[in-house]
């Protein structure tokens, strides 16, 4: 269900803006997207796991807020990230 630390480090190294970056919107959105994908797979198998479904909805909301922030701050970075992650926005 949760992503491993190794996978998280791979995502951070792929989406980081500068060398010591771990908290930029791009990194946060990419990590949340990976967690959302993982949780979606879990919920396909365990349809009645409503506690995890609530966590999924919270993650989706957090990602939506970060995407809105990034779009308002820098549209080109936003569009590049959407394209790279394959999100439908």
From Swiss-Prot:
Keyword vocabulary terms for this entry: Ribonucleoprotein, Ribosomal protein, RNA-binding, rRNA-binding
GO CC field: cytosolic small ribosomal subunit
InterPro entries for the chain: Ribosomal_uS15, Ribosomal_uS15_bac-type, uS15_NS1_RNA-bd_sf
GO MF entries: rRNA binding; structural constituent of ribosome
Function in brief: One of the primary rRNA binding proteins, it binds directly to 16S rRNA where it helps nucleate assembly of the platform of the 30S subunit by binding and bridging several RNA helices of the 16S rRNA. Forms an intersubunit bridge (bridge B4) with the 23S rRNA of the 50S subunit in the ribosome.
Subunit-level organization: Part of the 30S ribosomal subunit. Forms a bridge to the 50S subunit in the 70S ribosome, contacting the 23S rRNA.
Family: Belongs to the universal ribosomal protein uS15 family.
Name of protein: Small ribosomal subunit protein uS15
Organism: Oceanobacillus iheyensis (strain DSM 14371 / CIP 107618 / JCM 11309 / KCTC 3954 / HTE831)
The encoding gene: rpsO
């Amino acid at each position: 269900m949760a992503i491993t630390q190794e996978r998280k480090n791979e995502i951070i190294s792929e989406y980081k803006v500068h060398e010591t970056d771990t908290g930029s919107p791009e990194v946060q959105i990419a990590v949340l997207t990976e967690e959302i994908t993982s949780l979606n797979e879990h919920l396909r198998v365990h349809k009645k796991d409503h506690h995890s479904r609530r966590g999924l909805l919270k993650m989706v909301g957090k990602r939506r807020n970060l995407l809105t922030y990034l779009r308002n701050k820098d549209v080109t970075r936003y569009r590049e990230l959407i394209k790279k992650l394959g999100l439908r926005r």
